[in-house]
Amino acid sequence: MNLAEENTIFKPLYSLKHSSINAYFSKNSDDFVVRERPLYEFSGKGEHLILHINKKDLSTNEALKILSEQSGVKMRDFGYAGLKDKQGSTFQYLSIPKKFESFLSNFSHSKLKILETFTHENKLRIGHLKGNSFFIRLKKVMPSDALKLEQVLMNLDKQGFANYFGYQRFGKFGDNYKEGLEILRGKKMKNIKMKEFLISAFQSDLFNRYLSKRVELSHFANDFSEKELLQIYKISKEEAKELKKQEQFFKLLKGEVLGHYPFGKCFLCEDLSAELERFRARDISAMGLLIGTKAYETGEGLALNLENEIFKDALEFKAKMQGSRRFMWRYLEELKWRYDEEKAHFCIEFFLQKGSYATVVLEEILHKNLPE
C-alpha cells in the first residue's frame, strides 16, 4: 500500500467473472449457522471442563460475560478456540476450570445454551480448532438466479477461492487498519489487546491488497498475451510463457512462499513444475505475507517485486510486528446446496479450515460487498 493513499478503503478483486446475483441475505440465527469443529477429541479426564454452547445473536465475549456473571468464573480463566460473530447461531466450545462445574448446574439464558460438557487436560487456546462448518440461507432467489448460483458453486468447488480477511476484521466502518498504522507511527494506547488487534488489522489490509494483486495477475495471465504480460510486469519471455502455461486460475510464481496444505511448514517455490502438480492436487498452496520480523521471506523474481510494491512503505514498521504467513488460496470442503423454488430459498452448506471467512466466500458467490 502506498501510505499516501491510506485513507482509501480497499475492496479486493473477485476471482470469478459472473455478474452479481440477486438474493437476500440476513445474518440472523435462522439463516446463518456456524458449527465449530475441534482440533482433537476431548479426553474425558483432567482439570478443565469443556462447554459445548449454542449462542444466538451474541458475540463470544458477550457469551463469556453472561457465563461469568452466573458462574463466578473470571473472564481470563475462560478458554476458547476462536472468536465468533455476534449475528447468527453459533455452536462452539469453551473451557473453564472444572471446580466451577457446580455453579453452572442451574444456568439459564434465552440466547445461550450449554448443550453438553466434557473434561479435558488443558485449557482451550486460540487456534485449537480444525475449522468451522457453515449453513447459509439465501432468500428471494428466483429460478434463473438459482441456476447461476449452482454454476458459481460448481466453479468455486473446482477452483477454490481467494482467502481474504473478511470485513469483520476491519471494524464497523472498514477502516480500523488506519488506527493500527497510527499506533505503529507512535500513537499511545494502554489497552494491549486492542493495540494488537488494530496492528493486526493493518497487517490484514496489506495482505488483502497483495492477494488482490495476485488475483489480478491471474486474470491477466488468462486474458492477455505473452507480449502484453512482458510489458505489464517487466518479466522475461520465459516467465511470461510459464504464466500462460498454467491452466488453474490462481497462478504460482517461482521464488514465492508456499505451505503444506491445509497445515504445514513454509518453503520456497524453487521447482515450479513440481510444485504446480502438488498445488493442483491441493497438497500445497501459496502463502501471503503478514508483515513482521518472524515471517518467512520471499525469494526472488515477480513474487518479490509484487510484494515490494504493496509492502515497501510499511517496511519502516516491520520491526514492531512479529508477522507470519497465511494461505492465499483455499478450498471449500463438504459443499452442498439445495433450492426450494416454492419458498425461493437457496441453502448452502460447506466447511472451511480455521482462519477463513464464510462472508468472503458469500461475497465471491453473490459479487456483492457485505454487510449491505
Curated annotation (Swiss-Prot):
InterPro entries named among the record's database cross-references: PsdUridine_synth_cat_dom_sf, PsdUridine_synth_TruD, PsdUridine_synth_TruD_CS, PsdUridine_synth_TruD_insert, TruD_catalytic, TruD_pseudoU_synthase
**In this UniProt entry, which cysteines form S-S bonds?**
none
Does the keyword Transferase belong to this entry? no
Query: Molecular function terms in GO for this entry?
Result: RNA binding; tRNA pseudouridine(13) synthase activity
Known Pfam families for this protein?
TruD
Q: What EC number(s) is this enzyme filed under? A: 5.4.99.27
The answer on whether this UniProt entry bears the keyword rRNA processing reads: no
Question: Which key words are in the record?
Answer: Isomerase, tRNA processing
GO cellular component annotations, sorted alphabetically? cytosol
**Annotated active site:** D85
Biological process per Gene Ontology, one example term: tRNA pseudouridine synthesis
Q: Which domain of life is it from?
A: Bacteria
| Catalyses which reaction(s) | uridine(13) in tRNA = pseudouridine(13) in tRNA
Boundaries of every TRUD domain copy: 160-330
Q: Which family does it belong to?
A: Belongs to the pseudouridine synthase TruD family.
What does it do?
Responsible for synthesis of pseudouridine from uracil-13 in transfer RNAs.
Q: Which NCBIfam families match?
A: PRK00984.1-3 (NF002154), tRNA_TruD_broad (TIGR00094)
What protein name does the entry list?
A: tRNA pseudouridine synthase D
